[in-house]
Regions:
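Cofactor-binding beta-sheet edge motifs in enzyme active sites
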Residues: 2-31, 36-287
């Protein structure tokens, strides 16, 4: 069993719980019109979690909401808001219709770190092109369903409609059905911050933005201020111990002896000494 196979059940369970239906597309298959888009569907088969799949970044739920899988973590910068804005912008769905799922290796690919406030700069462009490609394919599907050329269709709030008849429409949720697109993106073969996997779609021109750049309230601020937010230091698992490194006063120094009796008063504490590494672990943290 490879790593991808191991990850697949967790991702499937997550999507099933949220009613999510995955969208994936790539540049390798020609989408001349509706028939080509229809032929790319693979009913009941979930694509693997790899950087060359659009399903690794975007999922459209049955109710029309969107899950955006972002392979970075938010360390307080509020990048989830920016990513949700970018995805909502490209897909033409409301901001509140997008949920950003971050930093879970079972549901997202490795997009590197987010230090130095570079999370949006280095990772946002991938979610942007992924959302743009998902929109393009959904419009192709709508063109087939409505019997109208794709260039005559527009999207408002996740509803695809003709330019002349608003009533002649279909929602993203209705279009996806329970089927997966299973086509590869044009991945550059890199992981981490350099990862880039665009499709055929061109993202919007910034002059057409309606959501990106707007002031949006961060819902995570109040829980952080009132100590209701769980940080990584708050994580507790069964049998967990706490560790601390013992650092030398001079760089490059090597320990030659250790007085382990100095921690005998701490229940369960023990020394970890491996050549130049010295640390201590215990069941509790003594401040």
């Amino acid at each position: 069993m490879n790593q991808i196979t191991k990850l697949r059940p967790s991702r499937r369970a997550l999507l099933k719980t949220g009613g999510a239906l995955v969208v994936s597309i790539g540049a390798a298959v020609p989408f001349d019109f509706a028939r080509a888009a229809e032929d790319s569907l693979v009913a009941g088969i979930q694509p693997p979690l790899t950087p060359d799949r659009l399903s690794s970044y975007i999922a459209v739920n049955a109710d029309g909401t969107v899950s955006a899988f972002f392979g970075k973590i938010d360390m307080g910068q509020g990048i989830a808001v920016a990513i949700a804005q970018m995805v909502a912008e490209e897909l033409d769905v409301p901001f509140k219709a997008v949920k950003v799922v971050m930093g879970d290796t079972a549901t997202s690919v490795n997009q590197g770190g987010a230090s130095g406030a570079t999370g949006v700069q280095n990772g946002g462009k991938q979610l942007r092109v992924a959302a743009a490609e998902a929109r393009r394919i959904l419009i192709d599907l709508a063109a087939e369903k409505l019997g109208v050329p794709a260039e005559r269709l527009s999207v408002n709030g996740g509803i695809v409609h003709t330019d002349t008849e608003m009533a002649k429409s279909v929602s993203y949720g209705e279009l996806i059905g329970g089927r997966y697109f299973n086509v590869t993106l044009a991945w550059n073969g890199k992981i981490g911050n350099p990862l880039y996997a665009p499709g055929k779609a061109q993202p919007k021109n910034p002059k057409d933005y309606k959501i990106v750049g707007q002031p949006i309230k961060r819902e995570d601020v109040a829980p952080r201020v009132f100590a209701q937010f769980n940080f990584c230091t708050d994580v507790k698992v069964l049998g967990m111990v706490h560790g601390r490194m013992i650092r030398p006063t001079i760089a490059g120094a090597m320990p030659v002896s250790v007085d382990e009796s100095s921690i005998k008063g701490i229940p369960g504490a023990r020394v970890v000494w491996n050549q130049g590494f010295l640390g201590v672990v215990a069941a509790v943290v003594e401040i």
